[in-house]
Regions:
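Active-site metal-binding core of divalent-cation-utilizing nuclease and nuclease-like domains
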Residues: 76-83, 102-145, 164-167
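Basic, amphipathic alpha-helical patches used to engage nucleic acids or provide basic targeting signals
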Residues: 153-171
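Structural detector for short beta-strands of small beta-barrel domains
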Residues: 3-13
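OB-fold (S1/OB) nucleic-acid-binding surfaces
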Residues: 22-28
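Short aromatic-glycine-enriched beta-strand elements
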Residues: 16-21
C-alpha cells in the first residue's frame, strides 16, 4: 500500500470528526481526517501531521485537497487512515506466502473475501485454509484493528469504549 503526494503540516484544530485545519507551507488548509475516532491525545495543536495531497481534488469532486493520514507523537509516526490496516492486511494475506499466518499443516489462504457476515457480525476478511494432511478446508475470519492510542511506547485498541469491539470478539 502506498500514498502519493505526501506533505507534512502543522495541526491547528479539529472542529468535527471529519475535518481538520492544518498549516501547510504557511497556508491553512482544510483536510479530510481519515479516522473518525476521538484521537484527542494525538491531534494536539502544534503537532506534525502527514497529509496526502490530491492535485485533482476538484475534478474528483472532493471537498478537500488533503487527507490527514498520520500524526507524529514525539518520534513515533502513528497511522490515522482507518482504511490502511485493512488494505495492508488484505495485501499481506494475498501474498503467496502469508508469513506469520501459516500454522502447522495449514496451506495458503484461498477464497479471500472482504466484509463478510458471519453470525451477527461482519468481519473485515474471510478466507479458507486447507489442512495439508487431511485435505479438509476450514473457514477463517480476520478482524483488523488499527491503533491510535499510545502510552509510554505501547499502543492500545480501542481509544474509547466500544460495544462493537466486544461484539467482534464474541463473534470470533
Amino acid at each position: 500500500m502506498t500514498y502519493d503526494n505526501i506533505v507534512t503540516g502543522t495541526f491547528l484544530k479539529r472542529p468535527n470528526r471529519f475535518i481538520a485545519y492544518v498549516e501547510v507551507k504557511g497556508d491553512v488548509k482544510t483536510c479530510h481526517v481519515k479516522n473518525t475516532g476521538r484521537c484527542q491525545e494525538l491531534l494536539v495543536p502544534g503537532c506534525t501531521v502527514v497529509l496526502e495531497f490530491h492535485p485533482k481534488a476538484k475534478e474528483m469532486k472532493r471537498k478537500t485537497e488533503y487527507d490527514l493520514i498520520a500524526v507524529y507523537k514525539g518520534n513515533l509516526l502513528i497511522n490515522m487512515d482507518s482504511q490502511a490496516p485493512n488494505q495492508a492486511a488484505l495485501e499481506w494475506i494475498r501474498e503467496k506466502e502469508a508469513k506469520g499466518l501459516s500454522l502447522e499443516n495449514v496451506g495458503i489462504p484461498t477464497n479471500i473475501r472482504r466484509e463478510v457476515t458471519h453470525g451477527e457480525s461482519r468481519f473485515d476478511l474471510a478466507f479458507e485454509l486447507k489442512d495439508e494432511v487431511t485435505g479438509k478446508t476450514v473457514p477463517a475470519f480476520m478482524e483488523v484493528k488499527g491503533v491510535t492510542l499510545e502510552k509510554e511506547g505501547n499502543v492500545f485498541f480501542p481509544d474509547a469504549p466500544t460495544i462493537r469491539g466486544v461484539k467482534h470478539l464474541n463473534g470470533l
